């Protein structure tokens, strides 16, 4: 075991641990893994299928193939404080400072019926300084540029065709060239090519029966339109969060960056079961047609019209049942992020949980040392798997926005729960926990005894 501990804030000299790591996929999970492993002194080489990163791309999903893809299609992502405090340590606060303009500021969500009548207000607890509501592509771009500044070897346009391991090493094959390291971190998203190597269970993503229209509107165009600019009212002080509830569709319009961007989403029944792509380009008219009978359509339509067709998608909500293991047979490869536990984008925790995986893994590698790589990977799984699985199975967080079966006749009869912000989720510091618990976890693994995590809710659900 490593004798000295860097602690959550500590950074080692580059390549000082003697541990070599391959990262496959450069989404939120992969970028965080590359950066955190570098911080803890591990040697990192990362591979990404896409060829380049658009300099001002504003869009992407937690799948790496979309985070770094074409510019401008886009919407938002919430990073809870459990994730924000991880990148808050990077670059002496430089990454945190770069994201400060995108802090999460709404204090409540205003809920309306299909006629546009105000029904209720759902309180959003005051966000900590390390919670962010930002554009997905901007977050990925910021992480990528920080990784570049650290000199991390990131090879774009590299399609991995094979994974392999034995008791001593693990590696990949990229276009016929063989690479090896002490371990391979598989962060290749919900459509992971590596997942089938870890489990005999059916690990393919399946459709949930729901889908979401998603897109980013042009804020400058909205300002110029008298019928649309209502959404920017009061955004000089706080962002706006508007929800319009119908029986078969729920429309959400949110501003972020104090009105710098306006994003629109609409959860609806998934009627396109034959389509199996990650996302489907859609026309804003598809959304407007779904609310054609709503009296408040005239309020929503001017904003939706500001979303160009090439920035508008219909995103099927895919899921994967919790896996039986994240670690490969020889203990030299591990799944993290969406490859291990995909979340619905409505959960508000997909990105943060991926970051927790990456940060804990880097620490476990540090504490186990080069001679105990399988122990490090199994310890990461022990610390992270139960926590991620509880969140993955929790319907409040896995589905997020629920379609309303029927609205009450008046706002007085409507009971709307506040947004659930649970201390055990957002106030958790995964890095401190990993340092505190590693010895107990390692002992349990080596002795074959049970490890009971306490990074879960008290009732375990």
Curated annotation (Swiss-Prot):
Protein name: FAD-dependent monooxygenase nodY2
Function comment: FAD-dependent monooxygenase; part of the gene cluster that mediates the biosynthesis of the indole diterpenes nodulisporic acids (NA). Nodulisporic acid A (NAA) and its chemically modified derivatives are of particular significance because of their highly potent insecticidal activity against blood-feeding arthropods and lack of observable adverse effects on mammals, in particular the tremogenicity associated with the paspaline-derived IDTs is not observed.
Oxidoreductase keyword on record: yes
Cofactors named for this entry: FAD
Highest taxon of the lineage: Eukaryota
Binding residue positions for FAD: 48, 136, 338, 351
Keywords assigned: FAD, Flavoprotein, Monooxygenase, Oxidoreductase
Pathway: Secondary metabolite biosynthesis
Molecular functions per Gene Ontology: FAD binding; monooxygenase activity
Enzyme class: oxidoreductase
Keyword Acetylation found: no
Coiled-coil portions: none
EC number of this enzyme: 1.-.-.-
Family in the record: Belongs to the paxM FAD-dependent monooxygenase family.
Active site, per annotation: 214
